[in-house]
């Protein structure tokens, strides 16, 4: 899956939604949050028509045994400013993680989407920025909803730093939580590569439904007790003290989702 992001090279939002290329973070923002539904898959093609078994990137069954997510990441900075990167992976059936909140002021292509596909490249490795943007963020309601559910307590009362906050495991099924420090130790920036394997090894039952002779396909999990739920990947970046708008971080990825069908 190719990297797509809703950020510009400045770290600001793209005016017309996600585009192909790295995700960018500005040092002026205390925290920048990206989120992605890694298991979002329909049984229909982006351009219309049903998926077939010869299309390896498409699912053709409502129940899939998810093996895991493989990802090769490249992170680079343009200055010696240090960064903290926290990755959290979790499973959930809560619709607040996959739907845009009506309270957002964003509209059209700038509205929150938990995954992105198009007719050329199919499903993408999306980095959708929910926070930051130098005060121009228009997905505040969705951002608050997601983080209120994910973390224990309230920001500013029970915690301040999202890279230190405890995940609320009563509300989500935590699968992975790791903090990585990015620092050059000299006057140059850093360029580092990471390989991540996130195992799942559970069934995912998609919320498909019949409509006469037509099967209405959903990209998301059912809300009942069947299956593991949607597998979400959240990346949080925080700059070190003294960072400014001139300090930038870029992240790109090549990702693959593996599953078996029943």
Spans of features found by a protein language model:
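N-terminal leader/pro-regions and domain N-caps
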Residues: 1-53
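Low-complexity, serine/threonine/proline-enriched polar segments
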Residues: 101-198
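Eukaryote-biased detector of low-complexity, proline/serine/threonine-rich segments
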Residues: 63-66, 188-236
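N-terminal onset of structured domains
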Residues: 39-135
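Generic preference for hydrophobic/aromatic residues in regular secondary structure cores
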Residues: 1-4, 89, 165-175, 195-199, ...
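Exposed low-complexity, polar/acidic, P/S/T/G-rich flexible segments that act as propeptides
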Residues: 223-262
